Amino acid sequence: MPSLTQTRSTVSELNTSAIETSTMSDSGHQNKPKGPKGITFSGETFIVPETHDMVKTLFDPTIKKSNFELIILGLLFSNLLVFLIPNNNLRISIFIGFYIFWRLSYNFGIGWLLQHQSNDHLLVQWAIKYKLFDKNNKNFLAKLVQSEIKSQRGDAYDINSYPIEFNTWLIFRKFVDLILMSDFTTFICVVYACSINNDYQFIKNQPSWLTMSRIVGGSILILFNYWVKVNAHNTIKDYAWYWGDFFFRQINNEELIFDGVFEMFPHPMYSVGYVGYYGFALISKSYIVLLTAIFGHFLQMIFLHYIENPHIDKIYGPSKNEINLIKILKLKDLKNFDNLKPLVGLYNFNWMRASDVINLVLSLTYGLIIPVFAKSLKSLFVLTVATKLFESLSINILLILQSQFKFFTKWSLSNDIPIEKSLNNWAVLYNSLINLTYSSLFGLNLGYFLQGTGSSLVTDYFYLRLFLGLCLIYTQSWINLSIIDSIGYFGWFYGDFFIPKSQSSIKNLTQAGVYRYLNNPEQIFGVCGVMGVFLIHPTVENLTCCILWMVNNFVRINFIEKIHMIRIYGEKEVNRDSGVTKTVKKHLIPDVIQRKMSNDDPKRRGGVANGTSLGDSLDNFIKELRNSTTKLSQQKLIELSQNLSFANSNYKLSIDGLKESNELKYTTIGTPITVSWQSPSNTHSIRDWVGLYKIVQTSYSRNKTILSSAGRWTYCTDSKGVFTFEKEKLFWEEGVYEFRYHLDGKHDVAYISEPFEIKSVDIDVPGDISEAGEFSKQLKTEIFDKIIDIKSINESIAPIANQADNVIEVYKLFSSLISKSTQINVNYRIFLNNDNLSISDVAHKLIDIKQVLQELSFNSSEKKNL
């Protein structure tokens, strides 16, 4: 689409030169102070004025308050009126109601607005629809909005000299200020009301040392929370704090920032950014405050998952090539596990896999059956310890033997077992033993519950211990999933112990995902779930198990895994500083000591970072309308064609090479389509363009196209011309299509071609292997030649397909066309899993499949006749 090309060009110029692009927006700001450059999603550039955070804006007496800010302050202080009510329990109920209202307004109100702003630019569209920033609009709402902006920015601020997107963001900020400040204020009111309840219960009914410990511990959490917020704001500024990237982009801010607190924790504003809430709960000694904090934090994580993360992926996500590489690596990862996701715990369970069923039976036996029939808790404890010791010794010894002597690999090769199979066998053994240990631990605690035996160490604060224990268990589960997501199943099952580095797709240790923050996340969080079990049920037996788990985890990581990693990847690669270490050094350790302690190699700092450009990111904002499920009749499609509306037009489009049929003219999938155009020479623009579209997606309008052409277009530089649409400029699916002639780089339609159909070619699979040669040539001509340039039916497909930007999509296209053309389903993984596969091999596979299907059909019908 031409407009996207222009936007990319503008962004490229702004990113690669210090000279400002001479756009209309910039020319209006030449005399203004320089600041960060912004660009709207329509391509308009401007200088982003300085703004202040909500606390400074609302509470700094030196800053003039806007109209909305005065209203916000009034609403905040109005909460104090509730304290005039003498009944404190009623106050608590009222404040909780207020908090729920503001929290829902935050996560679902702001969330809804941001989601639609991200997908549809809703807020900006409202501003345009109601002309909120038009000086000539005398509507009350427009005057109110313009008055608010003037009161924010001053009378010298020229509203029309800034994009609508920026002005809309300024108004949206006040809406955010109201909700966020009200949310926090009502929560503090809940904390205070609960603390003073029952004659200041938060400092009574406890030993003084415990009370002081609560207050100090809670205060530390609150101060840490404050530092997180301040550091985060100093890092990302107002632009990201107020979700500015939902409205416009800042030049040279095309990548996510990993600095300060963002280098220590994933999504710190949503994760550790709420620990202060739990600090308030600790100080107030109130389960009501704790539940309120959990409620607010839970809703915030929902907001992160459904609103923030999708937008982050859309704007800052990896490029198409990086996504493609990740997909390939994950699929290649499964080659070591029979192309199926291996069992981790009981995750990825498959009833058709015998090892999975055996794992389930053993887990149920150790976790349920044995505890139910056990005569004493001592026997359960001995079983748990024995199982853990057996797992620890056997796994550790095997890893040492494999690392030092390649014991497992030599045994596999001597028995003619491929090394990939040896890793799969190891994975089954490793996971089975891990499952036994955790099942035994679960069975031990189930035995306590069934026999009604209480804790022998601590009996108080059960609900608090339950909450903290469940949090630790969840943390271990989440960390494990994050580790798998970062290093794959290959890394989870110690794949680099079994597969040579030259044959592995992993050449370096990852610094992505959870490993961005910690070098060894499993060392800290790998057994925190067992600590959680002890916290919930603090017995001597559980304490012993907890220590046993921790010691084994420490030994395995530091004396087995780390030594092997250093041998393979090098000491500098293994010992380089994690995000947490870097931040602690930066803020707490003097520079002189830092330089002596640093593990970073200076040569590393010259490396090129893998990132996405703003131009690539903007691709995600050219919205595609979804394919309609409405089925249109052929006659209806003809009625929708341009020929009935522009019969006397001076513009013409004609399509060459279409085949005749009883209904619409047609061509086959992948066949190049040549289109000719004709336009009046006196009005022709070199920016006129022709695009290819599916009719069911453009039937809403014959005069304007609002759907992205997704690259299927070409400029009409001359008033008459011919262009052949082929390969990436074609649709590779069946349907009814049309060409549209657009004027002057815009989306106004001057002419629409006759509708035509794209069909799958029909290829008959022979039943005799002797015909494989001719069949291979037919596959090459009708399918493969349309997608890749392959010379021979015996040439490997992979090296040529890998030259494409997205090899996964190429393989999927192969399988789709073959399946539709031959009526035999073929999975794209046959191309991915065999680098030497040729067209001839594909032909033989199809013939073999047909022969098997014919035999099965024959036997089936034969049985019916008996």
UniProtKB/Swiss-Prot annotation:
A single GO cellular-component term on record: endoplasmic reticulum membrane
Pathway in which this enzyme or protein is active: Phospholipid metabolism; phosphatidylcholine biosynthesis
GO biological process, one term: phosphatidylcholine biosynthetic process
Enzyme class: transferase
Lumenal side: 1-65, 115-175, 229-263, 308-353, 401-425, 475-523
Source taxon at top rank: Eukaryota
Record-linked Gene3D superfamilies: 1.20.120.1630, 2.60.40.2840
Membrane-topology descriptor: Multi-pass membrane protein
PROSITE patterns, A to Z: SAM_CHO2
Record bears the keyword Ubl conjugation: no
UniProt EC number: 2.1.1.17
Keywords from the UniProt entry: Endoplasmic reticulum, Lipid biosynthesis, Lipid metabolism, Membrane, Methyltransferase, Phospholipid biosynthesis, Phospholipid metabolism, S-adenosyl-L-methionine, Transferase, Transmembrane, Transmembrane helix
Transmembrane residue ranges: 66-86, 94-114, 176-196, 208-228, 264-284, 287-307, 354-374, 380-400, 426-446, 454-474, 524-544
Subcellular location: Endoplasmic reticulum membrane
Disulfide bonds: none
HAMAP family: PEMT
Function: Catalyzes the first step of the methylation pathway of phosphatidylcholine biosynthesis, the SAM-dependent methylation of phosphatidylethanolamine (PE) to phosphatidylmonomethylethanolamine (PMME).
Family: Belongs to the class VI-like SAM-binding methyltransferase superfamily. CHO2 family.
Protein's recorded name: Phosphatidylethanolamine N-methyltransferase
The species this protein was found in: Candida tropicalis (strain ATCC MYA-3404 / T1)
